[in-house]
């Protein structure tokens, strides 16, 4: 992985591909490359940032109206020029860009080497062009039909996940894409087509998109001034629906902010209003399913899992057991049958482990639903019920506004279920409408939070709370370590004295999420804070009450059920400003990807 873009049309391909790779930078990468076809295939690639590599390799000098580009995040082989994508076959007539992981590449590589193929990289990807080359040898004549057959025969040999873009010098007016458990979507115009791992790569050119299904092979042919699109699945021609994208390019611009992350945090009050309005019927339907089903799981990864953990507390207040579960553990822990409901939360709709959990649940006969931000993604096509988040495009790798949208959707679901079972949910409905104002008050604290962040010098941090905001302690720690590169650990404040308190000294700072004034947990958390102070630990309080702390971030004193919203924004700002203070790459932290599409 991590990002791919293809172009076929009447414009200079290298220019389009370069811009597309820039748009895909937020997905994370360590090297990049471009291949174009103009009689022969020209390939240039190297390690480093897109603009650095472009300048070094002269991307803009590459000619041709058809091409593919790739930004790589190393999974097999080191960060080297040879390991960067795209990759050739032996003849340098076939060129491939690939997202995903080929799990049986070692056996395939050994077989190909035994047949005389020479490899130049350590990657799993490089076996693919060589396999196609080998398959073509079996045909007496190279025609379009035999070429496509060679691709079909090749993918039958591949185990794993892949989104492929393929150029062939013998077919200079053609671009082929293949999808299997790794996202690939077409952007369509009459005289040109774009194909990429997500819509941000081509959103500025067209809003008409065609998501591809697993095992699809899409053949794009340039015929005079138009592009012919053919989709095959298991050798048979199929039709795929197109969708009209709702996002616009303004979402992909910083609009005066230093970083996308800060822009996206500042957008939260407006975004949450959007999330309060959408998917009303779907939320009603999902509420009914929750009432009917015996077992309810919310499966997710990373930040989305923390949203699921908040929901667990909301539903427990209605005496309904809802179990949050790490998607990568779902197949070993989830007890699933026909009376089970599995709700998958995934911002991208492509998270590999979460999609694997959904497919497993469907195989067991469970009802499935998804809370997702990308229309036309795999999640929307796999799940029985789709609830859109309404967050708009999120560019920064760290999830901020999408986390808040997930919370709003889950909170609305909690309200809906409560009404279905006859509970009075008036206070919760009233407070839902107040959440954007509460978030705005937290955003007003940003200068204070920035000053506090500058004074923090520790290398290790604890984030603690209790009850419903335990999830926010975990989320706060995750955000902090993601972008500051400092060690941070979230836990229940009650867990401290069971081992972790031995770490407390002047070199370990603690961020305490202090409960609202009417919470039964307030005195308990304050007592834990005193225990830390007694051991010379520095406390940063995120608090709606008077806490007598040197470092204190004030948040509105709200009902406990709504408190996760205000603590989340405060934690996001603290992580952001500390990362800025440390001069980190805030929007693209090292080693991370926006959409994790491999196991």
UniProtKB/Swiss-Prot annotation:
A GO term, aspect molecular function = glutamine-fructose-6-phosphate transaminase (isomerizing) activity
Q: A single Pfam family, by name?
A: GATase_7
Q: What range(s) does the Glutamine amidotransferase type-2 domain occupy?
A: 2-223
Q: What coarse category fits the chief subcellular location reported for this protein? A: cytoplasm
Q: Which NCBIfam families match?
A: glmS (TIGR01135), PRK00331.1 (NF001484)
**Quaternary structure annotation from Swiss-Prot or TrEMBL:** Homodimer.
Q: What does this protein do?
A: Catalyzes the first step in hexosamine metabolism, converting fructose-6P into glucosamine-6P using glutamine as a nitrogen source.
Name of the molecule in the record: Glutamine--fructose-6-phosphate aminotransferase [isomerizing]
Species this protein is from: Methanococcus maripaludis (strain DSM 14266 / JCM 13030 / NBRC 101832 / S2 / LL)
Name the gene behind this protein: glmS
